[in-house]
Amino acid sequence: MAGIVNLVRSSARSCALSCIVCLAISAPSQQLPTAPQPRQKLPQDGPARPKRVGDQACVPCHEAYSSSYLHTSHHLTSQPASGNAILGSFSGSGSTLKILDPIPSKSSPGLSFHMEVRDGGYYETATVGLPGHEQSHSERIDVVTGSGTRGQSYLYWLGDQLFELPLSYWADGHQWINSPGYKDKTANFSRSIYPRCLECHATDIVPRSSDPLTNHYDRASLVTGISCETCHGGGADHVAAHTATPAIAPSTATILNPARFVRDRQVDLCALCHSGGKRVELAPAFSYLPGQPLDSYLQPAPVDPATLPDVHGNQVGLLQRSRCYLSSPTMSCSTCHDVHAPERAPAAYSDRCLRCHSVQSCKMSQTIGPKIADNCIDCHMPRQPTNAIIVKTAGNAVHTTMRTHWIRIYPEVAQPQ
C-alpha cells in the first residue's frame, strides 16, 4: 500500500477545521460544519474599499517592474485554476493517492483520491468503500493557492461559498498529500475558507456578510494574487491623473510608495502576513491600508522572550530579534528583499549582507575560504524545521524547513562546507 501522507499546519490564523467523520466523505451539499464563534465582534464597516484598476494598468509606465513581478511568489500566491497553475500530476500513478486499502474480512473500507482532467476542468475525486460498494465525490478546482515554492492547496466554489479541497501538492516530495490541517484517513470537502484565510493569498474579495467567519462572497470580486495595489493602494486616481496629463511629475498624492514610509510602517506592510498567526483581528479582512499602523488592524501578539517564534510565518518577529535590525534605524524587509523580483539564490542575499559587513570580518572566512562571500545566509540564516507544516509518511514525520529570519551566529552550522 502506498505510504499514508498527511500535512498538518497548526496556526491560530489557519482556517478552522470542520467536522470530520472518519472514513466518510464530508461534503457541504450534505451538511455544513458549525463555524466557531468569532473571538470578538468586528466593526460592521471598514474603510472605503480602494478604487482599483488592476495590474495591467501599471504596465504602460512601469513595464520593467510589472514584467518582473509577474514571476514572484507574491504574485503567484493565488491564481485561477489552469494546467499551468496546478503543479501536481494528473496522469498515471502520480495522479492517485491511496490512503487505505479495503479489507473486506474486517468490513474496513478503502479510501483513495484521484486527480482528473475532464469536462474542461481539473477535479479532485475521493472514493471510499468496499469493492463493489464504493462511493465517490468530486469537486472542480477553481482557485489555486500557494506559489508552489513549498506547495499548493486548492479551493472550489459551491454557489457563492468557498471551500478547500482535501488534497494539496507538496513541492519537496513532488506528490499529492492531505491538505493542511486535515486528518488522515478522511475525505473532507467542507472546510470553509474565511476572509482572513484569503487575505494573504489574494488582493481582494468582497464578503457578503460582516461575520469574520463567513465563506459567502461576491465571486466576481475576487482579485487573485498579491497585486501592485496590495502595497501601493488603489491606483484609479493615479492612472486617471497620468492619463489626463502624461507629462505630470510622479507624485505620492495619488499613489502610495512604501519606499517613502517610515521604517515601522514599511515593516507593518510585510507583517500583515509575516508576523505569525496569533494576532487578533480588530477590523475586517482586506481593510488594512498600507502606511497605517498595523496595531490598529491586528492586535499585537504577546511577546515571550523565552519562546522562539516558529520559522513559518514569523519572519518579522524573528528579524526584530536580530542585532542587524536592532542596531540600524533604517533596516527593513526591503533592505534584503526586492519585492519586484523573483530572487532565491544565496548570492543575491549575501550581496546585501556585504553592503554592511566584510568577508574579512567573518571569523570563519579563513576556514571556509573565498566561497563564503557568496553564501552568508546558510550560516547566519539557516533553514530550520517548522512545527507549523509537518508531512507524515508511513509513520514518519517530516518537518518542512524554512529559512529563519533571526540573523545571528549559529555555531552548529558554521562549519567548513
Model-assigned labels for residue ranges:
Residues 14-26:
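Bacterial N-terminal signal peptides
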